[in-house]
Amino acid sequence: MLDKVKHIILVLSGKGGVGKSTVSTQLALTLAEADHKVGLLDIDLCGPSVPYLLGLEDRDVHQCDEGWVPVYTSAEKRLAVMSIGFLLKNRSDAVIWRGPKKTAMIKQFLEDVNWDELDYLIIDTPPGTSDEHITVMECLKTVRTEGAIIVTTPQEMALEDVRKEVTFCKKTGIPILGIVENMSGFVCPNCSECTNIFSSGGGHSLAELAKVPHLGTLPIDPRVGELAGTGKACVKELPDCTTSEVLRELVRTLTTVGQ
């Protein structure tokens, strides 16, 4: 039920472990902090981490006549969340499904969740390019999709996978809103100095090569990592850190694109 959603944004990554779900959740929280009504759909069936990141693992989804009712992060209902993680008894439970069953579940997530009026729906996708991604693209053909944000890290292997992701988006007709480079340097929790651990500037160079916007560079910040599992917005808890600055600028960019 996407007819009540104004803007749909996909968050993609070429490989796992680049912080895609963290970017998705903090982006959703930042939009909600800016008084937007937001939905966050986690379709990473084999590795659903959104319920954990938002501190919602003990919550259940319910069904009504109109479909599944998403989980809300607060009484204000500014952020609604749906994930297969809510349907599993334990976080360690494995989803061992073949392609057709995964496809059916993703279609159900996209068509049968009873979202309220939403300004933004953020879709956190699995890493790579697979059946799940093709299903999402097919289901979104009939609705307006703002585009995709691609998350990468500075390592050459991650950048190589992002090149494939860029090609996938172009072939499937999904606009690329830009590239976010995550884990670029380590911020010392004592002096706040940022030290490069991997190579630097890869995300920016790749954005130039692919002729898409570079949306920001996020460092490894232990203070931000401590927010995992709390459901707290980085922009509210750590307003002066680099990650918050990048997230606020990202939201400004997205809201400008959506106008």
Curated annotation (Swiss-Prot):
Pfam families: ParA
Keyword line: 4Fe-4S, ATP-binding, Cytoplasm, Iron, Iron-sulfur, Metal-binding, Nucleotide-binding
SUPFAM superfamilies: P-loop containing nucleoside triphosphate hydrolases (SSF52540)
InterPro entries on file: Mrp-like_CS, Mrp/NBP35_ATP-bd, NUBP2/Cfd1_eukaryotes, P-loop_NTPase, YlxH/NBP35
Main location (coarse class): cytoplasm
Gene Ontology CC terms: cytosol
Chain positions recorded as ATP binding sites: G14, K15, G16, G17, V18, G19, K20, S21
Transmembrane feature ranges: none
UniProt-annotated location(s): Cytoplasm
Keyword Cell inner membrane: no
Gene Ontology biological-process annotations: iron-sulfur cluster assembly
UniProt GO MF annotations: 4 iron, 4 sulfur cluster binding; ATP binding; ATP-dependent FeS chaperone activity; iron-sulfur cluster binding; metal ion binding
Cofactor: [4Fe-4S] cluster
Keyword tRNA-binding carried by entry: no
Cofactor binding comment, as recorded: Binds 4 [4Fe-4S] clusters per heterotetramer. Contains two stable clusters in the N-termini of Nubp1 and two labile, bridging clusters between subunits of the Nubp1-Nubp2 heterotetramer.
Residues annotated for [4Fe-4S] cluster binding in this entry: C188, C191
Assembly mode: Heterotetramer of 2 Nubp1 and 2 Nubp2 chains.
Function: Component of the cytosolic iron-sulfur (Fe/S) protein assembly (CIA) machinery. Required for maturation of extramitochondrial Fe-S proteins. The Nubp1-Nubp2 heterotetramer forms a Fe-S scaffold complex, mediating the de novo assembly of an Fe-S cluster and its transfer to target apoproteins.
HAMAP family: Mrp_NBP35 (MF_02040), NUBP2 (MF_03039)
Family statement: Belongs to the Mrp/NBP35 ATP-binding proteins family. NUBP2/CFD1 subfamily.
Protein name in UniProt: Cytosolic Fe-S cluster assembly factor Nubp2 homolog
